[in-house]
Each structure stands twice: as C-alpha cells, then as structure tokens.
C-alpha cells in the first residue's frame, strides 16, 4: 500500500515530463523567460519529485546560488514525489497563463508553439491562447506534419526514463548541472573545478591545461598566478635587502645587537 502511494500516477508522470521538457527547452532569447523566483520553484519541485526530500548538506558561503537552490529544495520538507510533480505542473500552468497575459501574441513566432505543444497534448486544463492564434498555429502544424516529417522537432531534453535517477549513478554536483536549466543556468555558471574558482578569484589569469599547471607559461601569456607572483615579489625584496646591507655604510659603522652579542661571546 505504501509503495502505491509513493509511485506517481502515469498521467501525472507524463504531464510532469512534458512540463520539464518545456522549461528546459525555452529559448534563451525568447519573448518570455521565467523570473528568478519561478526558476527556484521549478528547481525545488524537480529535485523533490526526482530525488525526494533534501538530504545533502548545504553548500558553503562561497556558493551563494547553490545555497539559494538548497534552501528552496529543503523548504519542501517531506513532500511526496507525486505532490512535487503536481506542484510542478501547477506552476507550469501559472507560467503559461502569465505568458498569455503578458506577452503580445504578435511577438510570438509560430514555431514557438512547438515548445508548448507537449503540454496541450497531455494536460487537458492547460491555459490556452485565443482561438484565432490557435487556428493559425494549428494550420502551420498540419502543413508540417503532412509535408515534411523531418521538420517536426521533438523535445530534445524529454527524459527517456520515467524512473527517478539513482544517487549512485550521478553525484549531487552532476545532477545539479543536468537540471540547471530548470532554475538558474542562465544566471550563474557552475564552477566545476578548483581551477575555475582560482580564475574567478584572480581576474585576468589565463586558463592552463592540467599537465602545464606548474609552468603555465604565464610570462608569455599574461599575468602570473597568485603563488608565482608572491614568490617573485619576495625574491625581489630579498635581493634588494642584500644589496642594501652590502652597500650601506651605516650598517657597517653601527653594528647591531647581533654583532655585539657575537663579539662578547668570542671574548668570553
């Protein structure tokens, strides 16, 4: 009985997959882009529906975007997977209604309907634009289907397996990168390695291949790395101090406490 409640219904799962494919394939420069809060909600519902409650530790202070995402996911508590899928679909309906209300239909290209078509096929109560717009788009779609089948673009990111991904097959960071377009991909590129972190802390450093990490060719390509620069400055000041000690007459005429101490030791 418990497993039946936990497993989502087939219709709900199909609607969820269609909504995920639409969000992941929204054009970057299209007429509408979800807001920051909407992307966080989509991300949290997606993680809850595919992985369950948030059990991973919160990211560090150096990853503010990761902390926002973690807070949104963790705020869902013990919400079931089916409830998370339903919430994702409901949020998708609100977004569709917002697009219809705010974006002028004259600015929406006809091929834009290809991104939203999966929703109208599986979600009966999906908000729809005016009938005049639907008739124009439906006629375009029928011409494509009857003429050239290859012109019909299938959803590129539609999940092939309805089962949620297992934690053993992907690490949490890999999962975040896979579904990043559900939330914050366009706002903050993910730092996948310490090398990228060093480049973000030190602007202007050129990226180096792993095998040339130590040499790096910084003298020819650009500014030196942080470590090499500090060591070079240290050597410069050390040599300057040596020259100053050799050429300074005051140093020779006025021996310091160390010279007096060595002289007294020799006399004793």
UniProtKB/Swiss-Prot annotation:
| UniProt record, GO biological process | fatty acid metabolic process
A Pfam family name for this chain? ACBP
InterPro entries annotated for this entry?
Acyl-CoA-binding_prot_CS, Acyl-CoA-binding_protein, Acyl-CoA-binding_sf, FERM/acyl-CoA-bd_prot_sf
For this UniProt record, the keywords arranged alphabetically read as follows:
Lipid-binding, Phosphoprotein
> Is Phosphoprotein tagged as a keyword?
yes
Q: Name one GO cellular component term.
A: cytoplasm
Phosphoserine (modified residue): where? 166, 171
Q: Which Gene3D superfamilies match?
A: 1.20.80.10
- Binding-site positions, an acyl-CoA: 23-32, 43-47, 69, 88
Q: Which residues form the signal peptide?
A: none
Residues in ACB domain copies: 12-101
Where are the stretches annotated Disordered?
A: 151-175
Annotated function: Binds medium- and long-chain acyl-CoA esters and may function as an intracellular carrier of acyl-CoA esters.
Protein name (record): Acyl-CoA-binding domain-containing protein 4
């Amino acid at each position: 009985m418990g497993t039946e409640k936990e497993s989502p219904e087939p219709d709900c799962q199909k609607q969820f997959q269609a909504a995920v494919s639409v969000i992941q394939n929204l054009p970057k420069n299209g007429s509408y882009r979800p807001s920051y809060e909407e992307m966080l909600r989509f991300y949290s519902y997606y993680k809850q529906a595919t992985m369950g409650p948030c059990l991973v530790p919160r990211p560090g202070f150096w990853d503010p975007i990761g902390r926002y995402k973690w807070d949104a996911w963790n705020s869902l508590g013990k919400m079931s997977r089916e409830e998370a899928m339903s919430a994702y679909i409901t949020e998708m309906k609100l977004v569709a209604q917002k697009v219809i209300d705010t974006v002028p239909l004259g600015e929406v290209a006809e091929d834009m309907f290809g991104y939203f078509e999966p929703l109208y096929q599986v979600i009966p109560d999906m908000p729809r634009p005016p009938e005049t717009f639907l008739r124009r788009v439906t006629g375009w779609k029928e011409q494509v289907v009857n003429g050239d089948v290859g012109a019909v673009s299938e959803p590129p990111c539609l999940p092939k397996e309805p089962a949620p991904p297992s934690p053993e097959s992907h690490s949490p960071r890999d999962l975040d990168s896979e579904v990043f377009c559900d939330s914050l991909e366009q706002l903050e590129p993910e730092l996948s390695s310490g090398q990228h972190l060093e480049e973000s802390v030190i602007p202007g450093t050129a990226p180096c291949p792993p095998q040339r990490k130590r040499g790096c060719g910084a003298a020819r390509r650009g500014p030196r790395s942080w470590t090499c620069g500090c060591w070079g400055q240290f050597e410069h000041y050390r040599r300057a101090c040596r020259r100053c000690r050799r050429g300074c007459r005051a140093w020779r005429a006025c021996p310091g406490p160390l010279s007096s101490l060595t002289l007294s030791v020799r006399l004793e």
